[in-house]
Amino acid sequence: MNDTADKLTFTRPDDWHLHLRDGNAMRSVLPDTARRFARAIIMPNLKPPIVTTEQAAAYRVRILSALPAELAGRFEPLMTLYLTDTTSPEEITRAQASGIVQGIKLYPAGATTHSDAGVTDIARCEATLEKMEELDMPLLVHGEVVDPAVDVFDREKIFIDRVLTPLLQRFPGLRVVFEHITTREAVEFVQTAPNRIAATITAHHLMLNRNALFTGGLRPHHYCLPVLKREIHRQALLEAATSGHSRFFLGTDSAPHPVRDKESACGCAGIYSAHAAIEFYAEVFEQAGRLDRLEAFTSFHGPDFYGLPRNTDRISLIRESWQIPEQVELGEEKLIPLRAGEHARWKLA
């Protein structure tokens, strides 16, 4: 990374966890990601979900077609399939052969937005997981239990004990990405796990703790899943992200929702951060005194874990304050982005 006091130039990053939606909403938000990132792992939780390789290929075409002309050829969507109780080993073989599917996403049924079709019992997926292990197809995990008896702030910690640890014992060769980790326990799990286990960390979980949900009143635009945690957990995530450990890397989990779905009696979970994602990460690393480790976290660790080449082009950020918009277009509606109306310290050059 080449940097001065007022400019950072480094290898173009990738986003290893992104929600793009579809149709006009996708056309609205896709440029924010494509300007900053060369590639992104695209989440499959559409309505209906992306459960076959054929559907993933069609979705990929829609994404590429939605890129504005000035960004054409600059962004590559990396596709995923939504794991269900009925996903077959044959579908995993097709996914691997396609060259476009980079992972299979495990959503415990009901764990987050559009997860109703998710896995009800991981034991039902044994043959499929065996095929994934055989073909070295990564399993991307939303790591929360959905047991109503478990406190919402403990869902990730309990998932490690009840689901993830037994899963890795049963499938010792399975490659797993523990997505959007939020707890000290998850950090420690990855640090002590074999090299086949990695984790993504979001910008919002690095910047916010659970107080942000209630500052001056209820803050629905800070509601996400996994939910924000205590400050001790944010500090653990910050230390992990800036440590240089090769199995922690960037995944924004940027998730656009219209204002009406957030400001609701039963609001949706999700934070939109794609409008300033790499700028937010730079700010976090600068505050931690670890700007020298930003490039590895954002641009090297992810492709290295997935077995993909690192990007060869570069981006620059300049130290310039700019105001984040109060609202962003989302198709025919509006969304409120992370830190709406506030000022960011770094700006995309």
From Swiss-Prot:
SUPFAM superfamilies: Metallo-dependent hydrolases
Keyword Hydrolase: yes
Residues annotated as catalytic: D253
Reaction(s) catalysed by this chain's protein: (S)-dihydroorotate + H2O = N-carbamoyl-L-aspartate + H(+)
GO CC field: cytosol
GO biological process: 'de novo' pyrimidine nucleobase biosynthetic process; 'de novo' UMP biosynthetic process
GO MF annotation: an example: zinc ion binding
Listed pathway(s): Pyrimidine metabolism; UMP biosynthesis via de novo pathway; (S)-dihydroorotate from bicarbonate: step 3/3
Keyword Magnesium: no
Keywords of this entry: Hydrolase, Metal-binding, Pyrimidine biosynthesis, Zinc
Residues that, per the record, bind Zn(2+) 1: H17, H19, K105, D253
Quaternary structure, from the entry: Homodimer.
NCBIfam families according to UniProt: pyrC_dimer (TIGR00856)
Stated role: Catalyzes the reversible cyclization of carbamoyl aspartate to dihydroorotate.
Protein name as it appears in the record: Dihydroorotase
Source species: Nitrosomonas europaea (strain ATCC 19718 / CIP 103999 / KCTC 2705 / NBRC 14298)
Gene, per the UniProt record: pyrC
